[in-house]
Design a protein with these regions (language model features):
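Acidic, low-complexity intrinsically disordered segments
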Residues: 1-194, 366
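Radical SAM [4Fe-4S] cluster-binding motif and immediate context
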Residues: 138-294, 301, 306-310, 314
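A structural motif corresponding to the C-terminal end of an alpha-helix
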Residues: 24-35, 195, 282-293, 319, ...
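Radical SAM enzyme core and accessory elements
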Residues: 36, 117, 145, 346, ...
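Flexible glycine/acidic-rich beta-alpha junction loops that bind and position SAM and/or redox cofactors
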Residues: 1-3, 91-93, 212, 264-269, ...
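Structural recognition of alpha->loop->beta junctions
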Residues: 93-111, 245-255, 311-326
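Alpha-helical structural signal in soluble globular domains
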Residues: 27, 31, 72, 76, ...
Length: 485
């Protein structure tokens, strides 16, 4: 996995357990001997490991290690199956290291494969065409080592996303069928009921993507006493009524894909759901309801020049955004962005280890690759400076909001070495009460800012304002390295 890479960050890949593998395990009969290995949190010893079947979930930055594991198992005569985002994008590459590959999601193909494997007739390629979660079994959380993860209560109640952004990996993964679909609400609520503790993290690319489903889910969660985090779009935040329902159900922090402050970039990347949306109004609306904001921003789009880093950071600080996640634009194989970059000769290499949103793997239009990488790191440094955290906290209307901002922003980045130490010492469980304590203080509305129905009156939409005035995929988050059956 990426755990063997020099670029590995424990805090990123030790957040969530590998739900994809635990979901596949739910389809197996009760008497099957199943072990889930996640090299992000503990090494895998191959010496005495010779199962009947090894299933490895592959994403781009773990591909090198995943293929090495697959080759090692095959040399021992183990049947190896590979699936995941990277396999679907580059099936010929993956097939060289596997007996079976899965293209697309596995809800329809995995049960067919299990029947074929039991009969000794397993195929080489299984391609998903039927998209439904109607027969999804409960996730085998009993196979996960919860104490090794910072956020053990992660959950996914939908697949895909209703939008078609050019840079998103998920477009390739869900090609050939529905790109967005959900569980039945009752099934989702039952899965939530099976989780202990108060805190939840929805890993769905867009929990608000189907308004009818989201509304029913939030109604069902009222009274559960849960505190939860999720991802949503600017458009969803500005939709009257839906945010209020989410907050009443326990929403305390939202990952929002702002991505860019440039209307030209939004158009080029087909991020139409953000066009002519008032970003500042979305942040105010979340803060008015006591919801913390984790803003996502992507650098390196064609309208970006070297000034984009300072402008973006200043905007985020000025809005009082609690945490920001910055990315270098990365053309993942299988995406429309990759195809454009390849056709234009702008790809610098195909070293998948470096396709990690931290390295410039293409030639930017208006700056050098080195300037793009330097600006990315500078953005992180500037946003998380103590003075910047203080300025962001001061943007809140009340003392409680300012203190929450300071605690969350500082706790997440300024103490990352401490988090890494806790992870390596396998003491992550002691940090969950800290997270729940911070989140329990959210949901309290800023003093002097009673929420009102959203109105655009007097506020110019993004597309008409000057720039001064941005999954999978958590695409990669939540995927483990190997399931041995």
């Amino acid at each position: 996995t990426e755990a063997t890479s020099p670029f590995f960050r424990p805090i990123k890949y030790s957040l969530f357990p590998p739900l994809g593998l635990a979901t596949l395990a739910g389809y197996l009969p009760p008497d099957a001997q199943v072990t889930i290995h996640d090299e992000h949190v503990e090494p895998l010893a191959l010496d005495d490991d010779t199962p009947d079947l090894a299933v490895i979930q592959v994403y781009i930055t773990n591909a090198r290690r995943a293929y090495a594991l697959a080759d090692a198992y095959r040399r021992r005569g183990v049947h190896v199956a590979l699936g995941g985002l990277h396999v679907t994008s580059l099936p010929e590459e993956a097939a060289a290291h596997a007996d079976t590959i899965f293209l697309g999601p596995g809800e329809d193909t995995w049960p067919r494969f299990l029947d074929d494997f039991a009969r000794g007739t397993a195929g080489a390629v299984y391609r998903s065409t039927t998209r439904t979660l109607a027969t999804l079994p409960p996730v085998r959380r009993d196979l996960l080592k919860r104490h090794l993860y910072l956020v053990p209560n992660s959950i996914v109640v939908s697949r895909g996303c209703p939008h078609v952004c050019d840079f998103c990996y998920k477009e390739a993964f869900f090609a050939g069928g529905k790109g967005f679909y959900t569980q039945a609400v009752d099934a989702a609520l039952a899965e939530i009921d099976r989780l202990s503790g108060r805190h939840l993290y929805f890993l769905d690319d867009h929990l608000f993507g189907d308004r009818r489903f989201a509304s029913a889910l939030f109604a069902g969660m009222r009274g559960m006493g849960r505190l939860w985090q999720a991802a949503g779009t600017v458009n969803a935040v500005l939709t009257p009524g839906l945010l209020e329902q989410a907050v009443e159900a326990g929403l305390r922090s939202l990952f929002v894909g702002f991505e860019t402050l440039s209307p030209a970039n939004l158009t080029a990347q087909r991020k139409f759901q953000n066009m002519k949306r008032d970003y500042a109004a979305a942040v105010r609306r979340l803060h008015d309801h006591g919801v913390m904001v984790n803003g996502s921003f992507v650098f390196g789009m064609d309208d970006d020049d070297p000034s984009v880093f300072d402008r973006t950071v200043e905007w985020a600080i000025g809005q009082g955004i609690e945490t920001a996640t910055f990315h270098v634009l990365t053309p993942y194989p299988g995406t429309a962005l990759y195809q454009r970059m390849e056709a234009a000769g702008r790809l610098r290499h195909r070293d998948w280890d470096l396709y990690d949103t931290r390295h410039a793997v293409f030639q930017p239009a208006r700056m050098s690759p080195e300037a793009l990488e330097d600006g990315y790191w500078r953005a992180y440094r500037e946003f998380y400076r103590w003075t910047s955290i203080a300025r962001g906290a001061a943007a809140h209307a009340d003392l409680a909001g300012a203190l929450r901002h300071a605690a969350y922003a500082a706790g997440w980045k300024k103490f990352e070495p401490l988090w890494d130490l806790v992870i390596r010492a396998r003491r992550t469980a002691i940090m969950l009460p800290v997270l729940e304590s911070i989140l329990s203080e959210c949901g309290r509305r800023d003093a002097g800012r009673p929420p009102a129905p959203y109105s655009t009156r007097g506020r110019a939409p993004l597309g008409t304002r000057p720039l001064e005035s941005l999954g999978a995929n958590a695409a990669d988050a939540g995927y483990g390295s190997a399931s041995v059956v």
